[in-house]
Design a protein with these regions (language model features):
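Mg2+-dependent prenyl diphosphate-binding active-site environment of isoprenoid biosynthetic enzymes
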Residues: 13, 17-18, 22-254
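Charged, compositionally biased N-terminal leader segments and the immediate start
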Residues: 1-10
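Alpha-helix capping and helix-coil boundary motifs
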Residues: 4, 191, 263-267
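Mobile late-domain/C-terminal helix-loop "cap" segments
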Residues: 256-275
Length: 275
């Protein structure tokens, strides 16, 4: 995936370097503890999918400019903030194969640093000075929250179907991909057709990305996912592969399957689940 990502991003190679500068400058704080935790969070660049989408969208529609870098930075900051809060909600010890912020600095600081990052994202938004962009960001924040709450609600009730699943991943994952494309486009054009087309592209790409992540939870490993196999299943998250498996079974078969799955997860015998 990395080689393909680099190939797709060839037109914005130099722009990514400029983005890195803008992103790092946006995170500075006068509080030493915040800087320490933030540096730990961003020590590895990761794939930077969302900034790439913003930059590429602007490039497609016109020219990349200062507002594009601000948009790309605020979206990556927002993404990092949601990861910090997600790890608290999910009680996660690992993030991309490394100890989570909560594991090292505990949940109180995790939540507060996540809040700090949200505030820095808002600061970047203010610099863009665009009411349309503010509305997109507000809608994004609403969708992200609703998606996470819906996931928790359905995990507790264990009642989820394909329709609910796509609503959930659209809000908690695809919304950020869509906003990345849409905001990037807005910095380079006023053409509503282009802006909406890129927004829809981001939405579908985000859904596909989440489905791939669900599959990796079953067939992947900590080396390529940054988390142990079966992590989502252990957290009672009903992913699309599991929904399709259960859909083909009778009520009795579902109960037996869920019981066996629970026993295998408890014994960490994940190879049997893969088979």
């Amino acid at each position: 995936m990395k080689s393909m990502l680099n190939k797709i991003s060839k037109p914005i190679e130099l722009n990514l370097e400029e983005f890195d500068k803008c992103f790092n400058e946006s995170l500075d704080s006068e509080v030493k503890t915040i800087n320490t935790i933030v540096k730990y969070l961003v020590r590895k660049k990761g794939k930077r999918l969302r900034p790439r989408l913003s930059l590429l969208s602007a490039k497609i529609c016109g020219d990349i400019n200062l507002k594009t870098y601000k948009v790309a930075s605020l979206l990556e900051i927002l993404h990092v903030a949601t990861l910090v809060h997600d790890d608290v909600v999910d009680d996660s010890d690992l993030r991309r194969g490394w100890p989570s912020v909560g594991r090292i600095w505990k949940n109180k600081l995790s939540i507060l640093v996540g809040d700090y990052l949200f505030s820095k994202a808002l600061t970047n938004m203010a610099d863009i000075d665009s009411m349309d962009s503010v509305k997109i960001l507000a809608n994004l924040a609403s969708r992200l929250s609703q998606g996470e709450i819906l996931q928790i609600e359905k995990a507790l009730s264990k009642n989820i179907n394909e329709e609910v699943y796509f609503k959930m991943i659209s809000d908690k994952t695809a919304s950020l991909f869509s906003a990345s494309c849409k905001l990037g486009a807005i910095t380079a054009t006023k053409d509503p057709t282009k802006i909406e087309a890129l927004s829809q592209f981001g939405e579908f790409l985000g859904q596909a990305y989440q489905i791939k992540d669900d599959l990796f939870d079953i067939v992947g490993n900590i080396g390529n996912t940054g988390k142990p196999s079966g992590y989502d299943l252990k957290k009672n998250m009903l992913t699309l592969p599991l929904i399709y498996i259960l859909d083909k079974k009778t009520n009795l078969e579902r109960k037996i399957f869920k019981f066996n799955l629970k026993m295998m997860l408890r014994k960490n015998n994940f190879n049997k689940i893969k088979n």
